[in-house]
Amino acid sequence: MENLPPNRGMWNQEYSHGRISQSFRSAKPLLDRKRPIENAPNSSNPLPQRMKESMDTESVSHNINFNSTPLMELSANTPYKRLKPEIESYADGHPCGLRTPPPRFDLDKEIINGFQTDIYADVGSLSEAFVTPLKEPERVTLSNGCSTSSILDDDFDDSILEEIDLICEQSARKAACQTPTTSIYQTPSKDNKSSDPKASLDFRDVEKFEPDSNVKLKLDEETPTIAADPALLNSMPDECSKYMLSLNDRQRDAACSNISTPLMVIAGPGSGKTSTMVGRVLVLLNEGLLPSNILAMTFTKAATSEMRERIGKSAGKKAAKDITISTFHSFSLQLCRMHADKLQRTSEFSVYGHGQQRRAIIEAVRLYEEEKKNGSKTSVPCESGEGLNGAGAGAVCPEYAKDLSKKWQKFVTQGKASGKSPEQCRKMGNEIGAKILGNYNDILKACDALDYHDLISCSVTLLSDFPEVFKECQDTWKAIIVDEFQDTSTMQYKLLRMLGSHNHITIVGDDDQSIFGFNGADSSGFDSFRRDFPNYKEVRLIKNYRSSRHIVEAASSIIKNNTKRCQSKSISSENSQGSKITVKECHNEEAQCAYVIDKIIEITNDGSTPCCSHGDIAILYRRQVSGKVFQNAFRQRKIPFNVHGVAFYRKKVVQVILAMLKTTFSECDDASYRRVFKALLPFEKEEKKRIIEHIEKISTSRKCSFISAASDIFNAKISGTFKRSQLTQGRKVLQTLDMVAKLVDREQSLSAVVTCVANMIPQKYLLEQRAVVDNDGGKLLNEDNDLRSVLQYLMDDVAEFISTHCTTTEEEDAIKEKKGCNQLHSFINYISERETENFRSRRRDNENSVTLTTIHQSKGLEWDIVFIVKANENEIPLLHESNGNASESGTSLEEERRLLYVAMTRARKKLFFLYVTVDSNWQVLQPSRFLKEIPGHLLQGDMSVNDCRKVHENLPNKTEQSVSSFGTDIKHEESKLTDNDVMNIPEDYASEESIAAYALNGNNFLKRFDVEVRSVVSHLFHNWAKKQAFQEPKRLIDKVRFVIGERLAIKKNKHKDVLRALKSSLTSEEAFQYAEHVLRWEQLPADTRAHIVREKQEHFQKLRIENSMGTSEATSKQIAFLHSLGCTVVPTSRLHASRLIEQYKSL
C-alpha cells in the first residue's frame, strides 16, 4: 500500500549487513555480547549510523512460526572480563574513522559452551540471565565514539555464525513443540530495542521475564500498564486525543497497534468493544488513510448506526459518513449487483427471505420426489412459489413435501453457510442432498434470485475467480474492521480473509458469545484466523463494565464448563458486588407470570431505593411461545411493554402491502401475486384456496406466469369452473393491481405511493384490526392489531430510508420526473435486507416499557434487571427435536450454555432465574442442568445449588445417557438427511406447528390409542414405575414388553389388540418420552399429584363449558345488555356475547 506509512515494527533490511544470515535475527545480540552494549553516558559523539538504525526499530508483532528465539535465551549482560582484551586495546588505540586492519580474536570455549547451555536450558532457568542489571558500571566504554559495530561485523568468523544459526533453529523447533499455545497478551518475540539510544530492552519485556515468582504477571487478571504514545496523541485532533485517553490500557493498546499487523481483539461482555473499534478507526484516520478506504462490517443495523454516531462525535460527521459501515449482507448485495453479469443474474435480481426460501425448498423437494417416482428429470419451473398444489405435483402429497422441506431447510441453510456445493455433497455420499441442493440452486437461478447465504458465497466467487474484482476491492478497502466475529460463518470468514489479504484487518469478538450456530455461525473462526494470519497480535479485553461482580462470577462459573473454548480467559468486574442471583421455583407458567408482575410492581414503586423504570427491566425466554402469557397478563395489569421478538415485516398486513408494491416490478415473482389475490379476494379461506390452486394449475400446464393465467381466467366472460361473482371479484383484483402500477408510474413521492397502497387494503381488514385495540397503556408496540401504528411504523421506515439512502443530484431529479417513483425498488430491497433484523436502531418508543424478547434477540442489549423465565431442562438447554437428547460433549449443549451465558450478562444489577414444575400440558419438568453449575454462595431463593443438584441426581438418568443406550432401537429418518449430528434451531424462527416437537410431551404416546383403552396403557406403565427396580426409562420399557408377552399368552385376555399395538410401538421415541414422564410423575409427592389432577379436571370442565357456549346462540338477555352498553356488534354465540360483555364493561 503506497499511502501507508512504513512499518515501524519490521526490520529495515537496507542496513542489515550482508554477511549475517537474514533468517537469524540473533547476530546483533551476539555482537553485543562481544562488545560494550552502549556508549558511555558522558560520550558526546553520536552513535554510528548503522548502530542507530538497528536501535531505532520497534518490536514486531507476535509470530507463532518464528525461526529463531535467541533474544530471549541469550544474555546481553555477559561481563566484559570474559572477552579477549584485544578489543579494549584496539578501541583505545585507534581513533574513529581511521581505516586500519582490525585485530583477530576468538571466543573463549567457555562462552561457546555457555551459549549452548543457555540455548537448551529450561525456560525457568533462562530468566536468571535477566537478574543482572542491564548496565554494568565496570564495563569499558568507547570514549572516542569509534564504530565498534562496523569493526566486529567485518571480521566476525562466518563459521561461528552458521554454527549458532543451526543451534538456534533447533532450539526454536524444540520450544515450538513444548509450548504450542501462544501468549494470551501478545508481546514481541524478536529484538525489541527502543528508539531511545539509552534503552536496550523494552519495558514490557523486562516485566515479562522478571525471575521473581512473587511478581509474575498474570495477564488474564491484571491489566498491563501501557502508556499512551505522546507523539500519536499530539498528532490527533483534540477530540480524538481525548477519546483515546478515555480508553483503558488494553483498549488503547488494541486501538494503537500497528495498522499493518493483523489484530485480534477478544472482547468479553460489557468490556467496551465498540469503544475500542471506534478508537481503532481514529488511529487509521490519523495514520493517513482516507475515510473512504476503511470498511467496517457487523451484523445489525443498530450496531452500524451506533458506530457511525460515535465516530462522528470524535472525527466529524463528514468522515463518519464517508466510512463504509455496513452489514455483511448489505456489503455483499452491493458487490453482487455491481457484478451481477458475472453471476449469471441481472442487476435487478431478487433477494429471497426466509419465507421465499422455504417455498423454494418445498418446490425443490417436490421436483426430487417426482424425479424419483418418474425416473426422469423434471424441468425446473420459472417460479419459486408454493407450487405443490398445481398439476405438476402429480401424486406428491403437498403435506408430505412440506414436512420433508422442514428437515431439508436445515440442511440447505447449513450447506449454504459453509459453501457446500451439490458436487461436494455427492462426493460425501449424500446423493439425495446433492439433488435437492441442486434443484434449489436451479430454482433460484431460473427466478433471477439469490438468498442471503448466496450473497456471501457469490461475493467469495467474485473475489476468487475474477482478479479485476479482487484488485478493485483491494484498492478500495485498505483497512478492514469486523465486529461480532464469533457470528461469522465459514463463507463469511473466507470473504474476510480475501478482503484482508493485505493484513490490515482487525477482528473483534468473543467465542463465548457464539450463539448463532443454527444459522451457520462457526466459532472456530478464531483458530482459522490464527492459522491464516500467523503474525497476528492478540489483545483481550477482560474487564466487564456492565454487570455486578456476583453476575460476572456466576456467568463465568457456567461458561468455564465448555471444553471447546479458551480456558485461560477470566473476566473481572470493578463494579460493586450487587445483589445475589435469585432462583425461584414456580408451580406453573401462570404462577411464574404472577411472580414476575409482583416483582416489577415492587421494583418500580419502591421508595427506599432510586426508582427503577419499566424500561430498565427485561424478560428473556428461550422460545417465542413462552412470552405470550406475559403479553396477556401485562395488558390486564396495565404494565407497558414491547416485544422485540415479533418480526415487523413478517406480519401478514405488511407483507400484503409489500407484495402489492412488488407487482409493479418486471421481475416480480408469482409468490407476490398469490399473496395479493389471497388478501384481496373477499371470500372464505377455503374458497380463496381453491381459486388460487386452479390458477396455479393453469399456469403450470401452460408454462406461463401466475398473473398471465389469472388475467386469462378472470377476463373471460364465462367460465366452466368459477361462478360469475368469482369472476367479478377476480377482475377487481386485476384492476387494483393496474391502479397500483399506474400510481407508481405517475407518482414521484415514495411516501405517497406507500400510503395509497396501504389504503387499498379491504375495509374489513381495518375494522378487524381496530376492534381489538387496547387503550389501557399496555399495547404491543409491534403488534399488527393496531393498523394505524403499523402504517406509522412503515412510514417511519420510509422517512428513514429517504434521509439516509436518497441523496440526489439535479440530474437525478430530472430523471426522476420522467420515471415516476424510481426509489421504490431500492426501498423494497432495503426492506428485504432488514427482514432478518431483530432489533430496531430507534428505541425511543420503548424507553419506559418492559422488554419481552428471546435470548437470541437480546444479544447486544442490556438492562438493570433481567428475568430469565422457564429455565427448565427442556427449554435451556432446548433438547433436539428428533431424539430429545443433547450430548454433553456435543456442540449443541455447549452452544446452549453459551446462550445462557449471553442471557446472564445482559443484566447490570439484578438477575432472576425462574423455572416451573409443571407445564401447560401438566407434564412434570425439571430445572435446567445449568443452574447447578452456579456456586451456591451466589444464589438466594427457594432453591439452592444443592437442591438443584439433588433434583438432577434423583432423576432416573440424564436424558442423553438414557437415549444413547436406548438409541439402538430408535431410528430417525432425519439423522440420515442431515450431515450434522445435532443442529440447534432456535424457536425464534420456528412455526407454531413445530413448537410441540421440541417439548417432551409424554401424552403424545397415549394419543396413538383410542380414548377407551388409554387407561390400560397408562395403568401398565404407572404400575411398574412404582417399583424401585425400574427407575430407568429403558428398564421400565423392557419390563412392560415382558409383561405384555405374558399377558398375550393368556387366552382369556380382553385387551389383546391393545397389547399388540402397544408392544409394536415400544421402540418409538414417544414411548421413551412417555416412560420418562411416568417416572417423573411417580416421584412427585402425593399431595402435589392430587393438586395437579384437580387442575386438570377444572381445566377440562372449563373447556367443555366453553365448547357448549360456543355452539349455542346468544340469549336475548345478553343481546339486550350489550345494546345497553352501546355495543353494535352482533354476537355469533353465547360465548362470544359473554366476552363482549366483559370487554365493554371494562371500558
Curated annotation (Swiss-Prot):
Outcome recorded upon mutating K273R: Abolishes DNA-ligase unwinding activity
Polar residues bias: start-end ranges: 13-25, 179-189
PROSITE patterns: UVRD_HELICASE_ATP_BIND, UVRD_HELICASE_CTER
Chain residue ranges for the region called Disordered: 1-56, 179-202
Ranges in coiled-coil conformation: none
Alphabetical UniProt keywords: ATP-binding, DNA-binding, Helicase, Hydrolase, Isomerase, Nucleotide-binding, Nucleus
UniProt cross-references to CDD domains, sorted A to Z: DEXQc_UvrD, SF1_C_UvrD
GO cellular component: a single term: nucleus
Location in or out of the cell: Nucleus
Cofactor: Mg(2+); Mn(2+)
GO molecular function: 3'-5' DNA helicase activity; ATP binding; ATP hydrolysis activity; DNA binding; DNA helicase activity
Record: residues binding ATP: A267, G268, P269, G270, S271, G272, K273, T274
Domain of life: Eukaryota
Known function: ATP-dependent 3'- to 5'-DNA helicase that could disrupt recombinogenic DNA intermediates and facilitate single strand annealing. Unwinds nicked and partial Holliday junctions in vitro. Anneals two single strands into a dsDNA molecule in vitro.
Family affiliation: Belongs to the helicase family. UvrD subfamily.
Protein name: ATP-dependent DNA helicase SRS2-like protein At4g25120
Organism listed in the record: Arabidopsis thaliana (Mouse-ear cress)
